[in-house]
């Protein structure tokens, strides 16, 4: 199953970008024997439209165009919270059901277009708090890596 991340906004060169790259590189290595591949990031420009609603609509179009056909997971503070093990198991279920691709969506400063959130196969929350897109990208990359280690029995995850 090919995993992609579509994120509004570009990360500048620096420690945050390096951390995302490091976690996704590890996820690629650990995920390959599990048939979890890709771990691509599509950085999409923030819309310059005049209103928040118009910006979200434009950004949603760019997100849909960037992601391969497949499942969509929108990251939103109003979404469902999952423990790391439950997240890993959900990825495995989708893979075992024969899903070819999954795209994770990280919105911009205005959030994600409500129509895209409603159409998503899952709306996932890391917290009811709002986080900067750079931190969400780091947290998602880490959780994807953690999921691959949980599924492979690697000792990285030491949860209860």
Put a short name on every predicted segment:
Residues 114-160:
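Structured adenosyl-cofactor binding patch, chiefly the S-adenosyl-L-methionine
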Residues 5, 73, 107, 140:
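Conserved RecA-like P-loop NTPase ATPase core
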């Amino acid at each position: 199953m090919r995993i992609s991340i579509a994120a509004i906004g570009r990360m500048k060169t620096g420690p945050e970008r390096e951390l995302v790259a490091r976690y996704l590189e590890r996820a690629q290595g650990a995920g390959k024997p599990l048939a979890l591949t890709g771990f691509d990031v599509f950085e999409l420009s923030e819309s310059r439209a005049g209103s928040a609603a118009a910006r979200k609509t434009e950004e949603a179009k760019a997100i849909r165009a960037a992601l391969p056909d497949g499942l969509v997971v929108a990251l939103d503070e109003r979404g469902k919270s999952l423990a790391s093990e439950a997240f890993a198991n959900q990825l495995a279920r989708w893979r075992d059901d024969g899903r070819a691709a999954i795209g994770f969506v990280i919105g911009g400063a205005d959030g994600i277009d409500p129509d895209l959130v409603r159409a998503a196969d899952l709306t996932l929350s890391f917290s009811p708090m709002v986080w900067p897109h750079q931190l969400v990208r780091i947290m998602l990359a880490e959780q994807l890596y953690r999921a691959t280690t949980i599924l492979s029995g690697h000792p990285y995850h030491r949860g209860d």
